């Protein structure tokens, strides 16, 4: 009988879907399809908001299943809400030495927060169990709500102002990831309200970009061309 490592039941399916959505979004961001990338980021945030609730519906979960869920969620969050949004900001123009420092800072803060959360959650599960009632610092999932809101501003402000805003978002949000302050966990009504606002925002982005794509979103075309030329050079070098 063939056996696989890991768990693949309904308690972790949303986490896997969230990861797939973000990986697909990364490919679309590289090809400058930012509206699809933002949609994928928002969808990953939606999945992350409900994966824990779904997992807790299974009453007979083993300790291995619980611990696997905690580790899997954080590892996927590194991609979905750490690397993915930082890449979007980079491709939108957060570059140069200051921009790269902010990208590194944001990713490091996200990873640090998730690792620290795993330690705290593992200890809490052993002593208390059940659902966590609050957060310490800003959850990384919040970027799935913040970045689509920020993305809307590019349609109504200058390129310089928009890029400055992206720099500020990476700095402030990254800092809030690691700042130790109590934050109540939102209830179901609050989550649904935020999802509604997010859905409207993504809808506006999809409709607006269908009729008008801001000129400064073309600024990354040369990046794609340089990457393609690099692979062509490598192929030609290795081909006898």
Q: What is the predicted function of each stretch?
A:
Residues 3-13, 67-75, 131-136, 160-164, ...:
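Short, amphipathic, aromatic/basic-enriched membrane-interface segments that mark the entry/exit
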Residues 1-52, 174-215, 231-235:
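Topogenic membrane-insertion module of multi-pass membrane proteins
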Residues 127-240:
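C-terminal membrane-associated helical module and adjoining short loops/tails
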Residues 14-20, 40-43, 79-82, 104-108, ...:
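Lipid-exposed faces of alpha-helical membrane segments in multi-pass integral membrane proteins
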Residues 56-61, 111-126, 175-185:
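C-terminal ends of transmembrane helices
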Residues 24-39, 79, 83-104, 149-165, ...:
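Helix-coil boundary and interhelical linker segments in multi-pass alpha-helical membrane proteins
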Residues 11-16, 57-113:
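Multi-pass membrane catalytic core of lipid/isoprenoid biosynthesis enzymes
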